[in-house]
Structures are given as structure tokens and as C-alpha cells.
Amino acid sequence: MENKRKLTTVLVSGNFNVLHPGHLRLLRFAKESGDYLIVAVESDRIAEGAAHVPEDLRIEGIKSNSWVNETILLEEPVGDLIKRLQPDVVIKGKEHQDKFN
């Protein structure tokens, strides 16, 4: 009998302006929380001035990480992306701990 286990999909989103050790800890934790890690990098338009590094360079930084299976450019509200992708797990950074999820 063939064992067909469903992969647990994890989603992380953010602007990832200047990739730093905190981002790396977040990505490692996210990968440990599932099998397939999708990282949504906020577009320059969505980041609204929070990102000083252009989106293509921020995406390149995330794609270079071996924990990340897929990188996408986030050009819609993150709630809409979650509804569309329906990941099993959504990981938010510490800066979101006091916000409604």
C-alpha cells in the first residue's frame, strides 16, 4: 500500500527589508513547522515606503535561503492571499504579536 501523506504548507509574509538574523530565525521556525514553505515578499507598492531595498533584491535574498520552497511577490492584502492559497499554517513575526490575527 502506497503512503500518500499530504504536505503541510506554511506561509510567511513580510517586506524583508535588509534580511537579518531575526528573519532567518523566523524562516527556520516556519520551515520546522511544516513541509513546504512559501514566503510572500511585499511589493514596493504594498510595503509603502517601509522597504528601502527594491522588491527584486528582497525577493532574491529570500530565494537564496535553502529553507524556502517558493517565493512570491505579494501584491494583494495578505488576508486575500491566505484565502487564495489556503496554507495549513501561517507564521507571523514578533512585530504582529499584539495585533489581531
What residues fall within each predicted segment?
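Nucleotidyltransferase catalytic core that binds NTPs
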Residues: M1-N101
